[in-house]
Amino acid sequence: MKTIGILGGMGPLATAELFRRIVIKTPAKRDQEHPKVIIFNNPQIPDRTAYILGKGEDPRPQLIWTAKRLEECGADFIIMPCNTAHAFVEDIRKAIKIPIISMIEETAKKVKELGFKKAGLLATTGTIVSGVYEKEFSKYGVEIMTPTEDEQKDVMRGIYEGVKAGNLKLGRELLLKTAKILEERGAECIIAGCTEVSVVLKQDDLKVPLIDPMDVIAEVAVKVALEK
């Protein structure tokens, strides 16, 4: 059984939620059948979106430092419950010997398996500007639909003034509003492309499937950890 390493703190609530989902998705009948999980919750990692938009400190030194600590502690592979941090995944991979399983790569595979051609993306402006979703999804022939500039302001408010600030009601209201707009424009599924989105949006909220990368990576992590 392999040990899962979670590079967390981006944000703390999303990190706790990923751990919860790993536990729930593990087909265990007793404690001893669960994989070992090492969580490094490092909320001091600089804001990823601010850096991508040229307004903040480079998060890579802290991301790499945290990944190295997970490796030293015995993690066999690393996952990150932060979509925007995946813009730096190659930099982290080069600095460590253990693999990072990319949440975005795994989500692209899942959407392809489900047969969707147009996916609406709810994510931070940093994630959208970095192009990480377009890059991975284009490999599988899936078009990424993003909100307009004004709609994206609502998404960012929902994430930062809503979920990250502990105001889940505001976060849910703003994110659901934008999800429904993308749905009306022809999105065949909605990607919860920021872990704060998956904290407040649920499948029952939408007519089209809600694809949650946090669910996808939790399932993949459990599968890899339990492989003989």
UniProtKB/Swiss-Prot annotation:
**Enzyme class per UniProt:** isomerase
Activity control mechanisms:
Weakly inhibited by citrate, but not by asparagine.
Which sequence ranges are marked TM in the entry? Answer: none
Q: Where is the active site?
A: 82 (proton donor/acceptor), 194 (proton donor/acceptor)
Q: Which InterPro entries match?
A: Asp/Glu/hydantoin_racemase, Asp/Glu_race, Asp/Glu_racemase_AS_1, Asp_race
Tree of life domain: Archaea
Binding positions for substrate? 47-49, 83-85, 164
Q: Which SUPFAM superfamilies match?
A: Aspartate/glutamate racemase
Alphabetized, the UniProt keywords read: Disulfide bond, Isomerase
**Catalytic reactions of this protein:** L-aspartate = D-aspartate
The annotated consequence of residue 82 to A reads: Abolishes racemase activity
- As given in the record, the signal peptide range reads none
Q: Show the Pfam families listed in the entry.
A: Asp_Glu_race
GO terms for molecular function, please? aspartate racemase activity
State which Enzyme Commission number(s) the record gives: 5.1.1.13
Record family assignment: Belongs to the aspartate/glutamate racemases family.
Q: How does it assemble?
A: Homodimer. The existence of the interchain disulfide bond seen in the crystal structures is uncertain, but disulfide bonds have been reported for cytoplasmic proteins from thermophiles.
Name of the protein described by the UniProt record: Aspartate racemase
- In which organism is this protein found? Pyrococcus horikoshii (strain ATCC 700860 / DSM 12428 / JCM 9974 / NBRC 100139 / OT-3)
